[in-house]
A protein has these predicted regions:
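Glycine/proline-enriched, intrinsically flexible loops and inter-domain linkers
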Residues: 1-423
Length: 423
């Protein structure tokens, strides 16, 4: 409202010429949107950031540690906290509160045909299946990056980043024709708890009588489950590249489910994790992030997301642009980088240097605590070149005027065959 805008605009204008430290958080207009677990997480050391009004746990302070940011262009005061969270996800099990996800229900007798027209992937799947897809514009650019879960013959749940919810709702509503379809923002009705890591199945079996085996609950499916003394819908997907489930829980049962997971988690080393860890894990796995690595100006094929595009399914927005790009060839590729020196950091917008020449910028960066160095993604021009041509070059990333040698890969450096998510 106007009171929110008055506070926030006064701060943003004042920051225009200030030092834009990495991870700098706004101080005004805070606490407007909170998860049902906000006070639970606060009591356990959460240090919050804000996106789209949502208070989200960015990292968790240790007992006796100050619960605030100390900004720097080098390693900030939460670096070791993130490392512990990151390695817990890679080697044990972590719990993320992702209630800030945007959740959109699309239903009606024309819901399937509507989504087939807007989404690049195949939407005609069995109820219970989860589809990773993009919504494209006429140029093949990415308007939205989302998962779609088919709940029934006529109902679908779209899960989008919290920061893009209003944009995605507008795009959907803009493209409704003379169709019987209802589009509803259902975000306030459910919280999302993400149980992620190789010990995720062990934890889930302690709190639920349901079967979480690969046979009963394979990757890319959603199941209704009992958990503690409550109910949830468990989606077997991941944004960190590990075995895990996103638990969609009615907001009135969220605290109970959290407490059940926390109590059972003591036996398996459960660790609460924040958004900074989510980000570092997803960049290790080379998962794209909308607004950084993929935007409406980035072609879906050049972003390396062709596996989620099905031109043979029939017409959809952007199909002609996809076919044209496929026939013409890619003019650039999204590449993953890891610095050879473990000390420097990558944040965003650092120059990519190929064979001594600046050719692009880093779209997103963080520290790969498992890979052992700073990691990032960025586009590299590759007109008429093969994958081998691109990877045969020498790459450096320019950081504060110094060029640091970097390893480059077109596949995820962490678990390139995606075996861990299907453990």
């Amino acid at each position: 409202n106007r009171a929110y805008l008055k506070d926030r605009v006064s701060e943003t204008l004042g920051l225009l010429y200030a030092d834009h430290f990495p991870y700098r958080q706004m101080a005004t207009a805070r606490g407007v949107r909170r998860s049902p677990l906000h006070e639970h997480l606060k009591a356990r050391g959460a240090v919050f950031g804000e996106v789209a009004g949502w208070e989200r746990a960015n990292w968790f302070a240790n007992d006796g540690q100050e619960r605030e940011y100390r900004y720097s262009w080098k390693r900030q005061n939460w670096f070791e906290n993130q490392k512990a969270e990151h390695l817990a996800v890679r080697n044990g099990v972590g719990l993320f509160d992702m209630t800030s996800f945007g959740k959109i229900r699309v239903e009606g007798r024309d819901a399937l045909s509507f989504l087939q027209r807007l989404c690049a992937n195949e939407m005609n799947v069995e109820p219970g299946r989860i589809v990773y897809t993009q919504m494209l514009n006429g140029r093949g650019g990415i308007e939205s990056d989302l998962t779609v879960t088919r709940l029934s013959e006529t109902a679908f749940l779209l899960v989008v980043p919290g920061a893009t919810l209003q944009r995605d709702l507008a795009w959907l509503r803009k493209h409704v024709r003379d169709e019987f379809v209802v589009i509803t923002d259902v975000g306030a009705g459910e919280s999302v708890l993400c149980v992620m890591g190789p010990k995720a199945r062990d934890l889930m079996q302690k709190v639920s009588p349901n079967d979480f085996s690969n046979a009963a609950h394979p990757f890319g499916t959603a199941r209704e489950i009992e958990i503690g003394m409550g109910l949830a819908r468990a989606h077997r997907v991941t944004y960190v590249g590990e075995l895990g489930w996103e638990l969609y829980v009615s907001t009135d049962q969220t605290a109970h489910v959290f407490e059940a997971l926390e109590e059972a988690g003591q036996d398996v080393g459960l660790k609460l994790c924040g958004i900074h860890t989510l980000d570092s894990c997803r960049i290790e796995k080379a998962f794209r992030h909308f607004g950084h690595d993929i935007t409406d100006e980035d072609h879906v094929l050049e972003a390396g997301l062709g596996f989620a595009v099905k031109p043979d399914k029939g017409d959809f927005i952007g199909r002609e642009a996809v076919l044209a790009k496929h026939n013409r060839g890619l003019s650039r590729r999204l590449v993953q980088f890891r610095l050879a020196d473990p000390e420097p950091l990558i944040f965003h917008n650092e120059a990519i240097v190929r064979d001594g020449k600046i050719v692009g910028t880093i779209t997103s960066g963080n520290y790969g605590h498992h890979l052992g160095g700073a990691i990032g993604l960025g586009y590299v021009p590759s007109e008429g070149e093969s994958d081998a041509d691109v990877l045969g070059s020498s790459f450096e990333i320019e950081i504060a005027g110094t060029r640091v040698k970097a390893e480059a890969s077109l596949k995820a450096m962490y678990d390139p065959r995606a075996e861990r998510v299907r453990m």
